């Protein structure tokens, strides 16, 4: 039976960080209502409703302007909700879809018009209910200008680096490339990501710190890693909250105001921080 994940903190703090105009949250998920958007039969989790209106209210508190909806694994390859929200809010949102390998080109074109800019794939270690590495569909979505958003597992970006770079698409690595923060900045997975960033083909999301450590907020072991990546290639970074933070059972639920304020610690330079929050997502997602 699928587990019901915990809710996000209902009382987000007003952050100390004053976000620049046009600031983007580059990684969120939306859910429900379940009567209209049911979870996939093989989804390992169910989530409470997290509507676009709820997220817009959060953005107003945080001072953010736009967002990138990543179609969640809980919906499998059904992107109906994503498409509906993009049609409803064409200026505020862009999307990342999970699609089937036999999706018609006409449907890819429709999704592109709606604002989908990439396809999410994951390490095979994350299961088969979501798309894994697939060069054939990557080549097809590249024809529509899409990038590949890839979520590694643990340190296996080392195994996937060359495969990803062989694709024609730009590559966006989720959640610090899933690298365990306890391994420090000299571990092979970190060096692999730095080399990938140097190619100019790869972007990295400063998002989901709770996916890289079992520590409670503010995730201090991740700070050296975040600073290293942001200093090495600020022009290749985007930031995301990962709201509504599903699958954190047994962990401390972060406050979204505090999550945004981590950028003050991770990227002390204001010009670089503003680039990560505004110019980079504008270029990557076409706002």
Label each residue range with its predicted role.
Residues 2-22, 48-66, 228, 234-236, ...:
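Mid-to-C-terminal alpha-helical segments outside catalytic/metal-binding sites
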Residues 2-11, 76-156, 162, 203-209:
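Active-site gating/metal-coordination segments in enzymes
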Residues 3-4, 131-239:
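Catalytic pocket-lining loop regions of alpha/beta-barrel enzymes
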Residues 24-28, 67-70, 94-97, 119-121, ...:
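Hydrophobic faces of well-ordered beta-strands that scaffold small-molecule active sites
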Residues 31-34, 74-77, 102-105, 129, ...:
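Active-site environment of divalent metal-dependent phosphoester hydrolases
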Residues 40-75, 92-98, 116-124, 146-148:
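Divalent metal-dependent hydrolysis catalytic cores, especially in the metallo-beta-lactamase
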Residues 77-93, 225-233, 255-264:
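Short, electropositive alpha-helical surface patch
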């Amino acid at each position: 039976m699928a587990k019901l994940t915990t809710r996000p903190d209902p009382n987000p703090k007003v952050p100390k960080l004053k976000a620049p105009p046009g600031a983007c949250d580059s990684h969120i998920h939306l859910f429900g209502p379940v009567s209209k958007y049911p979870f996939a039969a093989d989804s390992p989790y169910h989530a409470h409703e997290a509507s676009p209106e709820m997220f817009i209210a959060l953005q107003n508190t945080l001072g953010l302007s736009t967002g990138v909806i990543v179609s969640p694994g809980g919906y499998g390859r059904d992107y109906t909700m994503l498409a509906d929200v993009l049609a409803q809010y064409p200026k505020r949102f862009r999307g990342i879809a999970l699609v089937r390998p036999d999706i018609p080109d006409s449907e890819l074109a429709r999704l592109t018009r709606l604002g989908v800019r990439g396809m999410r794939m994951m390490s095979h270690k994350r299961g088969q209910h979501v798309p894994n590495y697939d060069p054939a569909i990557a080549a097809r979505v590249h024809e529509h200008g899409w990038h590949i958003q890839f979520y590694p597992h643990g340190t296996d970006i080392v195994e996937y680096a060359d495969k990803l770079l062989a694709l024609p698409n730009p590559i966006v690595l989720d959640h610090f490339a899933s690298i365990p923060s306890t391994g420090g900045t000299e571990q092979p997975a970190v060096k692999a990501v730095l080399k990938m960033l140097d190619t100019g083909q790869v972007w990295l999301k400063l998002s989901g710190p709770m996916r890289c450590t079992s520590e409670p907020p503010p995730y201090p072991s991740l700070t050296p890693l975040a600073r290293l990546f942001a200093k090495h290639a600020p022009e290749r970074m985007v930031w995301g909250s990962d709201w509504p933070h599903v699958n954190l059972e047994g962990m401390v639920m972060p406050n979204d105001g505090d999550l945004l304020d981590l950028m003050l610690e991770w990227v002390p330079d204001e010009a670089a921080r503003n680039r990560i929050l505004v110019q980079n997502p504008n270029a990557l997602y076409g706002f």
